[in-house]
Amino acid sequence: MLISQRPTLSEEVLTDSRSQFVIEPLEPGFGYTLGNSLRRTLLSSIPGAAVTSIRIDGVLHEFTTVPGVKEDVTDIILNLKALVVSSEEDEPVTMYLRKQGPGEVTAGDIVPPAGVTVHNPNMRIATLNDKGKLEVELVVERGRGYVPAVQNRASGAEIGRIPVDSIYSPVLKVTYKVDATRVEQRTDFDKLILDVETKNSITPRDALASAGKTLVELFGLARELNVEAEGIEIGPSPAEADHIASFALPIDDLDLTVRSYNCLKREGVHTVGELVSRTESDLLDIRNFGQKSIDEVKVKLHQLGLSLKDSPPSFDPSEVAGYDVATGTWSTEGAYDDQDYAETEQL
């Protein structure tokens, strides 16, 4: 460190899942260097656990319903994605849910094996009527970041096994700011203020400690340049860290036109993560989903720094016919007539 006074780290616990950390004093400029590194590592590289696939008794695919259950299978899957779990096992483990109606089915009805904990037992999964019965087998695995359902689809899986989007990251949100602080007569040193919010499966303190350990191991490669570093496994790159939260967003947040929104929902695309795993060809196969819908989706994803699976990195929204980049609006020629679309749907 370039200053004689050793930096200190203090924690202010705001809630059980949110803390604010202060690191000071830091040499001018090091606040942003350290803050950005910690933030990206916290969002992308903290290991966690998530449901990767499910199997519902009597169900062959997600586009159906379960007798006696208010929610359809797609809604049940969306609810299960919000399940907060932790696992001490490196291998996949299986949990079971069996409930007879009437009443609500919650995460507390899940029976986890030893080493697995469900941290939000009050979360609602489904609602059963008098004759309703729900039996679900859930596979939980450990991992990092976000993995779309298409990558969780195992070859040779039995009929009825439904892959699920997995959001492994136990960190929900990380923000930081850098203020000035005083050291003796100088007032231009940095004070890093880091705000960390996590799921109930890990404390912000443990998450920050894990991020720090990861960075120390990585920076050790530069410190020990006399050691051959080629081939060392350093884990996934944090370059896509900022996208993890976006993957979990529902497509409702994209503010799409009625045409595009209804087509995607009907196809079973409910989140941004599910959308970016599709190609343009996949979307064009959807009924009523044409090139204008493709352009609209690409523009909306570009605003989040994302793109469709096969979109070229050079995509420029200003080249889309009818779209005004300056105002973020569509001209009459490029816009959709949702009224006409609604009338067409009724026909």
Curated annotation (Swiss-Prot):
Keywords: DNA-directed RNA polymerase, Nucleotidyltransferase, Transcription, Transferase. CDD domains: RNAP_alpha_NTD. The keyword Transferase applies. Pfam families: RNA_pol_A_bac, RNA_pol_A_CTD, RNA_pol_L. GO terms for biological process: DNA-templated transcription. Its EC number is 2.7.7.6. GO terms for cellular component: cytoplasm; DNA-directed RNA polymerase complex. Disulfide bonds: none annotated. GO terms for molecular function: DNA binding; DNA-directed RNA polymerase activity; protein dimerization activity. SMART domains: RPOLD (SM00662). Residues 1-226 are annotated as: Alpha N-terminal domain (alpha-NTD). It catalyses: RNA(n) + a ribonucleoside 5'-triphosphate = RNA(n+1) + diphosphate. It comes from the Bacteria. Residues 241-347 are annotated as: Alpha C-terminal domain (alpha-CTD). SUPFAM superfamilies: C-terminal domain of RNA polymerase alpha subunit (SSF47789), Insert subdomain of RNA polymerase alpha subunit (SSF56553), RBP11-like subunits of RNA polymerase (SSF55257). HAMAP family: RNApol_bact_RpoA. Belongs to the RNA polymerase alpha chain family. The N-terminal domain is essential for RNAP assembly and basal transcription, whereas the C-terminal domain is involved in interaction with transcriptional regulators and with upstream promoter elements. Homodimer. The RNAP catalytic core consists of 2 alpha, 1 beta, 1 beta' and 1 omega subunit. When a sigma factor is associated with the core the holoenzyme is formed, which can initiate transcription. DNA-dependent RNA polymerase catalyzes the transcription of DNA into RNA using the four ribonucleoside triphosphates as substrates. This is DNA-directed RNA polymerase subunit alpha. It comes from Mycobacterium ulcerans (strain Agy99). The gene is rpoA.
